[in-house]
Amino acid sequence: MKAAITTTAKYLPEEIMSNQDLERILDTNDEWITTRTGIKERRILRDPKKATSYMCTEVARQLLEKRGISADEIDLIIVATMSPDMLFPSTACLVQGNIQAKNAWGFDLSAACSGFVYGLYTGAQFIESGNCKKVMVIGADKMSSILDYEDRTTAILFGDGAGGVILEAANEEGYGVLDARLYSDGLNGREHLLMPGGGSLHPASHETVDQHMHFIQQDGKQVFKAAVIAMADVAEEIMQRNNLTAETIDWLVPHQANQRIIHATAERMGITEEKVMMNIARYGNTTAGTVPICLAELDEQGKLHKGSNLVLVSFGAGYTWGGVYVRWQ
């Protein structure tokens, strides 16, 4: 018994921050950003009283409405995020309380940009084991809350957003979440993409704030190089393990980190541009939100049909990366 995605949903804040907006506060320009990343604009959740749990709750409510079920029917809520409202309680618990899912338990999963891919496969295990009937998996980040808008190497890349799915047992054999390969490399990845402040190693202090340690820090060249190799490798591995070809794959759904990384992954798979889901130009990198937002948009546009073969791939801080093969129910 495999787990199948039965519902998708997304939430993007209304406010748009364009490249032209960034030109006013950073030493950069639209052409430079677009050429190197493919990003034209991103969404920002400006309200200081609204955080990641707000976006997750909006997604959760949409999922329930679309599926036509009550919150009481949800057994488990997994939230993938690296920008929780607070260290504890978990964002998943906040969402559970907000939608009053009284029969659900939940937890947060921290795998940065790979979070949703990790969460999807994790959630699928609870369906396959028979311990849960309905699992909600949400990927969300309020990246604007941890961005240094004086640092053009990171400020141009990220936006705010959330997406999610409901997992249930597949109706037929051969459909649903059929395979996954997940990886980590904490030896080589830990120093290249991180937010050093706020944890038990560097708890908040005047010094950590003054040194901008509560913002994302990254070595862009190292991360780019690692991401290109890892995403392409895991995509190729998923294809080989499941006898998939460029012709039989209907959609590559990649993490929206950088247009060049996405193109390199598609090229390695031999997949044409028409089969690659990309919305990075409109939303930037919403980290854990990218893949589920892409799924929701494909679903909304009627591009997912019974039997559609999807390969989901992602890469994030850690390093973490992975791929999931889904055959749409």
Curated annotation (Swiss-Prot):
Stretches assigned to coiled coil: none
Looking up Pfam families in the UniProt record yields: ACP_syn_III, ACP_syn_III_C
Its recorded reaction(s) are: malonyl-[ACP] + acetyl-CoA + H(+) = 3-oxobutanoyl-[ACP] + CO2 + CoA
Source domain of life is Bacteria
Which pathway is this protein engaged in?
Answer: Lipid metabolism; fatty acid biosynthesis
Q: GO cellular component annotations, sorted alphabetically?
A: cytoplasm
- The UniProt record lists the keyword Metal-binding: no
> Catalytic center at which residues?
113, 255, 285
Keywords of the record, alphabetical order, are: Acyltransferase, Cytoplasm, Fatty acid biosynthesis, Fatty acid metabolism, Lipid biosynthesis, Lipid metabolism, Multifunctional enzyme, Transferase
Q: Name one GO biological process term.
A: secondary metabolite biosynthetic process
Q: Where is this region: ACP-binding?
A: 256-260
Enzyme Commission number, as recorded: 2.3.1.180
Which Cys pairs does UniProt list as disulfide-bonded?
none
PANTHER family in the record, alphabetically?
Answer: 3-OXOACYL-[ACYL-CARRIER-PROTEIN] SYNTHASE 3, BETA-KETOACYL-[ACYL-CARRIER-PROTEIN] SYNTHASE III
Which family does the similarity line name?
A: Belongs to the thiolase-like superfamily. FabH family.
Domain writeup:
The last Arg residue of the ACP-binding site is essential for the weak association between ACP/AcpP and FabH.
The protein's assembly and partners: Homodimer.
UniProt function note? Catalyzes the condensation reaction of fatty acid synthesis by the addition to an acyl acceptor of two carbons from malonyl-ACP. Catalyzes the first condensation reaction which initiates fatty acid synthesis and may therefore play a role in governing the total rate of fatty acid production. Possesses both acetoacetyl-ACP synthase and acetyl transacylase activities. Its substrate specificity determines the biosynthesis of branched-chain and/or straight-chain of fatty acids.
The protein's name in its UniProt record = Beta-ketoacyl-[acyl-carrier-protein] synthase III
- The organism is Chlorobaculum tepidum (strain ATCC 49652 / DSM 12025 / NBRC 103806 / TLS) (Chlorobium tepidum)
